[in-house]
Curated annotation (Swiss-Prot):
PROSITE patterns: ATP_GRASP (PS50975)
Enzyme class: ligase
A Gene Ontology BP annotation from the UniProt entry: 'de novo' IMP biosynthetic process
Family: Belongs to the PurK/PurT family.
Originating species: Bordetella bronchiseptica (strain ATCC BAA-588 / NCTC 13252 / RB50) (Alcaligenes bronchisepticus)
Keyword match Ubl conjugation: no
Known pathway: Purine metabolism; IMP biosynthesis via de novo pathway; N(2)-formyl-N(1)-(5-phospho-D-ribosyl)glycinamide from N(1)-(5-phospho-D-ribosyl)glycinamide (formate route): step 1/1
Annotated Mg(2+) binding sites: E279, E291
Name the record gives this protein: Formate-dependent phosphoribosylglycinamide formyltransferase
The enzyme's E.C. designation: 6.3.1.21
PANTHER family for the chain: FORMATE-DEPENDENT PHOSPHORIBOSYLGLYCINAMIDE FORMYLTRANSFERASE
Binding-site list for N(1)-(5-phospho-beta-D-ribosyl)glycinamide: E27, L28, E87, D298, K367, R374, R375
Record's GO cellular component terms: cytosol
Length: 406
């Protein structure tokens, strides 16, 4: 029998409090805050701008440049959390590694996982070169000329270019001929999270579909770490940004088994406790590793309505050492609600109409500022099958209209 001690949770805002700090307080972080608070955890939310969604529900909020190691160390030392939970990539992960090595704080799932996944180079080299997992052919380059040479030297056309540090499809494009290279290079330089720099160029895989396999490392009843899988999530992207997702996505038994093997290999190497969003390309029974996020995934917002425990509850339970339940409740779908306007303090119309249909729900993220293509909310739906759920979720998101405030 394991000697792992049973978790003991304290009372928020008291000397017994269990304190968790989230680095990143967007819409995903907000749901993690809520899940942790339901378990009696005292939560501190940190983001680079004021009034972020997670700030609005946390016990305390800080505005900090999380890529500044000195500023990040200061807020961690001030709050003295028991656990630090990175919710975005753009963080001074070298500092997290140092703090974890010092025994000053525990990082979920691990500081190494946060460090390796903060850019595409670390995780791709781990997956392809260390673990030997199947991936698209790739090269990392630093100049437009090197990009041309990589394509001519074997990557070929079409190919995909992405900044090594970006999210939500920013800076990502498809290069179909030599005429596209200059524009694609400029777009990648503009889309990187920390400015211009290194990119990955990948050979194009003719896949049938892509999935997110939410993979959870959590303590079992005996205290041992057990890996569990949610049902596969299908999703559709436009310009590299998720616009809808659904669960479960139909797969052959062989493809599902191979997907789980790949997810088990990469998450097992990254280690720790928590949820991982493993992105995979699938063609028939063949599966290729694409990316992994050591945190809840945007396509996983469908689990807010489709699962017994959603991805945020799974992450919260796992990082606290509690058992999890990854079962699907009912086929479901999510559909993004975009801002559509450039304004602060927007208002949402059509919400009653959106929720009039049975088996629907909605999340409005509470972002203080709207942009044309900024995610401001998500429509959710369940139905007897995925196709019905997708159509219903689309009706929910389309019914909501965003307008500038008075």
């Amino acid at each position: 029998m394991s000697t792992f001690p049973a978790p003991v949770l304290g009372t928020p805002l008291s000397p017994t409090a269990t304190r968790v700090m989230l680095l990143g307080a967007g819409e995903l972080g907000k749901e993690v805050v809520i899940a942790l608070q339901r378990l009696g955890v005292e939560v501190i939310a940190v983001d680079r701008y004021a009034d972020a969604p997670g700030h609005q529900v946390a016990h305390r909020a800080h505005v900090v440049s999380m890529t500044d190691p000195q500023a990040l160390r200061q807020v961690i030392e001030q709050e003295r959390p028991h656990v630090v939970v990175p919710e975005i990539e753009a963080i001074a992960t070298d500092l997290l590694v140092a703090l974890e090595d010092e025994g000053a704080v525990r990082v979920t799932p691990t500081a190494r996982a946060a460090h390796l996944t903060m850019n595409r180079e670390g995780i791709r080299r781990l997956a392809a070169e260390t673990l030997g997992l199947p991936t698209s052919p790739y090269r990392f380059v630093d100049t437009e000329q090197a990009l041309r040479e990589a394509i001519d030297g074997g990557i070929g056309y079409p190919c995909v270019i992405k900044p090594v540090m970006s999210s939500s499809g920013k800076g990502q494009s498809i290069i179909r001929s030599a005429d596209d290279i200059a524009a694609a290079w400029r777009y990648a330089q503009e889309g990187g999270r920390v400015g211009a720099g290194r990119v990955i160029v990948e050979g194009f895989i003719e896949f049938d579909y892509e999935i997110t396999l939410l993979t959870v490392r959590a303590r079992g009843a005996d205290g041992q770490i057990v890996t569990q899988f949610c049902e596969p999530i299908g999703h559709r992207q436009v310009d590299g940004d998720y616009v809808e997702s659904w669960q479960p996505h139909p797969m052959s038994p062989a493809a599902l088994q191979r997907s789980r093997e790949i997810a088990l290999a990469v998450t097992g190497d990254l280690g720790g406790l928590g949820i991982f969003g493993v992105e995979l390309f699938v063609a028939g029974d063949q599966v290729w590793f694409s990316e992994v996020s050591p945190r809840p995934h945007d396509t996983g917002m469908v689990t807010l309505i489709s699962q017994v425990q959603n991805e945020f509850e799974l992450h919260a339970r796992a990082l606290l050492g509690l058992p999890v339940d990854t079962r699907l409740r009912q086929p479901g779908a999510s559909s993004v609600i975009y801002g559509g306007v450039e304004a602060r303090g927007v208002a949402f119309e059509g919400v009653a109409q959106a929720l009039a249909e049975p088996g629907t729900d909605i999340r409005l993220f509470g972002k203080p500022e709207s942009f044309a293509k900024r995610r401001m909310g998500v429509g959710l739906a369940v139905a007897d099958d995925v196709d019905q759920a997708r159509a219903k979720a689309a009706r929910v998101s389309q019914a909501v209209r965003v307008r500038a405030g008075a």
